[in-house]
Amino acid sequence: MIQMQTNLDVADNSGARRVMCIKVLGGSKRKYASVGDIIVVSIKEAIPRGRVKKGDVMKAVVVRTAKDIRRADGSVIRFDNNAAVLIDNKKEPIGTRIFGPVPRELRAKNHMKIISLAPEVL
């Protein structure tokens, strides 16, 4: 459950380390984003010589949330941190690698490139 001002880790090698959500996309006055949703983020911490720099405003896909994700079979999945993957305007990831597990709910939201780059799909 990601809202405005939420800090997230970046789960790719785009050069960003931490980002802050500044807008949840999809509908007017939408307050919360969950796994697979697209948000607008500001880069708060980045490494030198990365593809992005501090202060950049980008779009990102939420890939992990500390809030439970309920599945149709009744099971629940949750992660230790909130994490996102930076994307471009064509919804393709900026980085070439994804770090950490991602849930299979991303498949239903058509983020197949992120699924294919991820080391583990839960």
UniProtKB/Swiss-Prot annotation:
One of its GO terms (biological process) is translation. GO terms for cellular component: cytosolic large ribosomal subunit. InterPro entries: Ribosomal_uL14 (IPR000218), Ribosomal_uL14_bac-type (IPR005745), Ribosomal_uL14_CS (IPR019972), Ribosomal_uL14_sf (IPR036853). CDD domains: Ribosomal_uL14 (cd00337). It holds the Pfam family Ribosomal_L14. Gene3D superfamilies: Ribosomal protein L14. Binds to 23S rRNA. Forms part of two intersubunit bridges in the 70S ribosome. Part of the 50S ribosomal subunit. Forms a cluster with proteins L3 and L19. In the 70S ribosome, L14 and L19 interact and together make contacts with the 16S rRNA in bridges B5 and B8. This is Large ribosomal subunit protein uL14. The gene is rplN.
